[in-house]
C-alpha cells in the first residue's frame, strides 16, 4: 500500500478502513467470500496494462502471446473443473454471461423467457422488469409453492406448456434448497426450449459434487466466479461444443471489447485452487456450517423459509417478529455482523425494506470457522434480533464478534 498511500492517501485510508471492517466483523452475505492472496496478486498485476480484444490465437492487437496462454489456462482449468466441453471466461459479470446466452438464442422484442420471480428467489437478470432482460424480452415467471416454499416442478411444466418460452432459466439468488436441473432440462425439451442454469451462488458446490451440477445436463450454464468459487468478480459460460461459437461471438464482439486479463488471470488461479482436494472439504464445510447455523436459528423460534437449507444460504422470514429485513440488517451491522435484507415468498414489503434476511456461510468458512462457531454466531443473531433497540446488547455482541473474528485470520494459511 506504500505507493497508493503516497499517491492517494484518501483512497488508501478508505481501503484500510474496509480491511479493518472485514477483519473485525463477520461477513454473512451469501454472495460474498474471500479470495486468496494469489488471486489478489494476479488481479493487481501488470496484465491490466494490455488490450487483448478477441480470443487466443485470434487477437486484434499484437503482443498478446502471454495473454493467450493465460486465457487458455483459465478455459482449460474451468473445463476440467466442471467437465465442460466449451468454456468462455471473458464475461465481466454473471449478468453479462446471462445476457450472452439470451442474445445467442432469443430475438429481442419477440421471444419469451421463463424464469424464477425475483421476489421468490430469482435474480434481476432473469427477466425482472427493471433489468435489460425484462425490457428486451417477453417474460413469464414461476415461483415456489407457498406452502412448502419449494420449486413446484409440475407447476413449472404446466406454465412452460402454456407460454411456450424460447428459454427456461433455472438457478436463483435466494433459494436455500437443491435444484433439480435435469427436471428443468426435461421440461425445456418437452416444449422445444433451451434451458440455461445460472449457478452463480452454488458454483463451488457444483464443482465439487456437493450440489448436483447442471453442466452437460442443461444447454447452457452461467456463473459468477466470486461467490462459492472463491475467485475474482467476474462471469463464465459453459456449454456443449455445438453452442460454443455463438456464445463466444455473443461476448465478443457482441457485447464486450477487450477482456479484463488481470481478472481472467485471477479466474485461472481460482480454478486451480478449486481443483485441489482441500476445496472439496471447504465446500462440504460451507454446507455443514449453513445447516448448523440454521439449526440454531430455527431452535430459537426464527422461521426459516422452506424449513432449512441444502446449500450455503439461509432465508429468514421476520414477519412474525414484528421486524423488517432492513431493521434487522442495520441492527446486526451495528454488532459487526454483515447480512442483507431480502424478499421472501409471498412478500408484501418493498425490496428496499423486505420481510426477510439472507444469511450465508462462504466467507466465515473461508476463515476456518466450523459448526461450533456457527452455533455461537447464531446466538449473537438471536440476541440482537430479540430487541434491536437494546444498544447495550448490540455493543456487547459487537465486542464478542470482534473477539471471535480475532481468532480467525482474514487470510489463514489455506488462503
UniProtKB/Swiss-Prot annotation:
It is an enzyme of class 2 (transferase). InterPro entries: PyrdxlP-dep_Trfase, PyrdxlP-dep_Trfase_major, PyrdxlP-dep_Trfase_small, Ser_HO-MeTrfase, Ser_HO-MeTrfase-like, SHMT-like_dom. It is found in: Cytoplasm. It catalyses: (6R)-5,10-methylene-5,6,7,8-tetrahydrofolate + glycine + H2O = (6S)-5,6,7,8-tetrahydrofolate + L-serine. Its EC number is 2.1.2.1. Homodimer. This is Serine hydroxymethyltransferase. It comes from Methanosphaerula palustris (strain ATCC BAA-1556 / DSM 19958 / E1-9c).
